[in-house]
Structure formats: C-alpha cells, structure tokens
C-alpha cells in the first residue's frame, strides 16, 4: 500500500524521536540554534505574550517562546507525533506556562484570533499542504500578530547551491545511518527539504494565506530562512 505524505512523515518522527535533537545539531553543524535565536530577536516577544508553536517536536522553540514571554505568558506546543511530544514533556516540566497538545497542523484546535504569535520551525516542509497550514496559522493568530516560519530553503548562489544539494541528498542520510541507525528516515528528510519552495515562493504563499508585510531573512547562504507575516 502506498503511504500518504502524512502517514510517511508520522512514521519518520515516531521512529527518530530519541535522536532528533542530536541529529539536528549534526546535520546543521549546530547552526539551527543560531537561526532560532536570530528569529526570536526578529520577533521581539514581550512578557505576557501568547504563542502557539506548530509542529513543536521536542519543544526547543516552545521553550524559547516561554523564556521570552515569561511566567505571565501562555505558550502552547502542538505536534502530531506522541513520541516527539514525550521528549518535549520531559524538557518542559518546569514551565507552568507551557501546554503541549497532540494535534494536527492542518486543523488547529483553537478559535480564530487566539495568539499573538504562531510559529512553525522545520515542520512546514513535512505537512501535506503548505498553504492549508499557513491559512490555519493565520486564522488563529490575532489581528496585528505574527506568523513565523523557520525552515530549510533553497540556496541561490551557484556552486554553493550544488554543494548544498549534494550534502542533503547523499551525506545527510549517511549521517542518519551512522548516528541514528535511520538511513531511510533521513532520506525522507532530504527529499522534503529538496522539494520545499524557495524563499520568494514561500513568501508568496504567506501572502496567499492572507498575511501582509511579509519579510524573509536568509541564513548561512540561504540554506535556511525565516519568514514573517502579519495578520491584517
């Protein structure tokens, strides 16, 4: 039986959850933490803010949001992998302002206009439909609030672009096999990264989702980028 994208992705993350954090550091050469820190600086989250972290995984960005919003903030992390959430639960035990929810990014279980910020980090490329998820994120953010995506992207510089795809297609899956015994799963991750829209194309999807003043900020030669859009 041919698996849907959603089924395949769910299987990937249910399997790799124990090594996910370690592999993120290996694959990105620890750059993903710097990218997230720079994104948080762009967002400028105040104390007491409300935020939803979609596809929160093991909770790193959820925790960063909670640290910024403080004890008076209200942060929710949502993911469809119970195994990934189990790691997030361990990491967020001391955060009373964080609530973790098992749910689907395609149908967010929240009313319209609920959050000041809605984020998704390295998760959008894995959903069945990018635009549907962006529309859902735009729906639940408050007017004037921010929808923020940190994701792998497509470098445009000749030479660097070719090296990037060589790394993702051949070397990254080998790292998965070596460090996490998961060659097949990390082969999927390189496929999803390779097929993901470039920065300009993703910015257009943000606008199609109804967001305004869309900006994007490339990192490390364009191997990753943050996109920010505001709700009208």
Swiss-Prot record:
A GO MF label: demethylmenaquinone methyltransferase activity
Keyword Isomerase belongs to the record: no
UniProt: S-adenosyl-L-methionine binding residues: 58, 79, 104-105
Keyword Methyltransferase: yes
EC number(s) stated in the UniProt entry for this protein: 2.1.1.163
Source superkingdom: Bacteria
InterPro entries: MenG_heptapren, SAM-dependent_MTases_sf, UbiE/COQ5_MeTrFase, UbiE/COQ5_MeTrFase_CS
Key words, A-Z: Menaquinone biosynthesis, Methyltransferase, S-adenosyl-L-methionine, Transferase
Catalyzed reaction equations: a 2-demethylmenaquinol + S-adenosyl-L-methionine = a menaquinol + S-adenosyl-L-homocysteine + H(+)
Pathway(s) served: Quinol/quinone metabolism; menaquinone biosynthesis; menaquinol from 1,4-dihydroxy-2-naphthoate: step 2/2
Recorded family membership: Belongs to the class I-like SAM-binding methyltransferase superfamily. MenG/UbiE family.
Job of this protein: Methyltransferase required for the conversion of demethylmenaquinol (DMKH2) to menaquinol (MKH2).
Name of the molecule in the record: Demethylmenaquinone methyltransferase
Phylogenetic classification of the source organism: Bacteria, Bacillati, Bacillota, Bacilli, Bacillales
